[in-house]
Swiss-Prot record:
The keyword Ribosomal protein applies. Part of the 30S ribosomal subunit. Belongs to the universal ribosomal protein uS10 family. Involved in the binding of tRNA to the ribosomes. GO terms for molecular function: structural constituent of ribosome; tRNA binding. SUPFAM superfamilies: Ribosomal protein S10 (SSF54999). InterPro entries: Ribosomal_uS10, Ribosomal_uS10_CS, Ribosomal_uS10_dom, Ribosomal_uS10_dom_sf. SMART domains: Ribosomal_S10. GO terms for biological process: translation. This is Small ribosomal subunit protein uS10.
Length: 102
């Protein structure tokens, strides 16, 4: 697999979970002998939802809720077959969304 690059994008609502997952991935890849670039923190996506507090007629009273999506990027340069196999077997938390590009 010489000259290839694997790009892993992680998304999660909790920054502690995403950081621990990125740390697990980096440790696994360095243990198998491939080079790692990252984890690179990407901009946090912030969605704000405005909801009327009262179910009836008071429109001036509103409440704001926000949802933050934290993102990280990890590049694996020159992965070995052992690296790919160990990444497939890696157990990560349920709250992390992973997308992999070759």
């Amino acid at each position: 697999m010489a000259g290839q690059k694997i790009r892993i994008r992680l998304k999660a609502y909790d920054h502690e979970v995403i950081d621990s997952s990125a740390k697990k991935i980096v440790e696994t890849v360095t243990r198998t002998g491939a080079k790692v670039a990252g984890p690179v923190p990407l901009p946090t996506e912030k969605n704000v939802y405005c909801v009327i507090r009262s179910p009836h007629n008071d429109k001036d009273s509103r409440e704001h809720f926000e949802m933050r999506t934290h993102k990280r990027l990890i590049d694996i340069i020159d992965p070995t077959p052992k690296t790919v196999d160990s990444l497939m077997r890696l157990d990560l938390p349920a709250g992390v969304d992973i997308s992999i590009k070759l």
